[in-house]
Amino acid sequence: MKIQSLGHVVIKVRNIEKSIEFYNGLLGLPVVAHNEKPPMAFFSLGNHHDFAVMEVGDGAASPTVKQVGLAHVAFKIGDDLDDLRDAKSHLDNASVPCAPVDHEVTKSLYFADPDGNQVELYVDASDAWREEPQRVAQSGPLAI
């Protein structure tokens, strides 16, 4: 067996409509399908679906840093720091606090969705990882 690629990610949310508004309305992910039981929305970036949200109800606990499970979902938004600046401005205008991070091979913004799930928007910044794979583990502050 050989895994060929990552197919999609599904995250659990409290309210499907709030999540659709966030991922489609704010971030611009195109909705391609819905499911009623369990309530789900599927988003596509060119495949049948790349990302989905599944409603688990208002009583669900928020994710925490010390909890086993998904740490964050990352979406590439371009190859230029100006793309990241535009994204930061967009998030700032929507009153979504974000943390800029320099990973050397990428420049990133980290923030939370309405349920506390962590999201990363990033731009590629360097191909250094091709020669030195360990470079993907770099992390520091980013001033943008």
Set out the residue ranges of the language-model regions.
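Short, flexible turn/loop "capping" segments at secondary-structure junctions
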Residues: M1-I3, V65-V68
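Short, solvent-exposed beta-strand edge segments and adjacent coil->beta transition regions
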Residues: L6-H8, V68-H72
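Core segments of cupin and vicinal oxygen chelate
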Residues: K12-V56
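Vicinal oxygen chelate
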Residues: V13-E17, V73-Q118, V123-W129, L142-I144
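Amphipathic alpha-helical "stalk" segments
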Residues: P39-A41, H48, Y122-I144
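Short beta-strand/turn micro-motifs at beta-sheet edges
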Residues: D58-T64
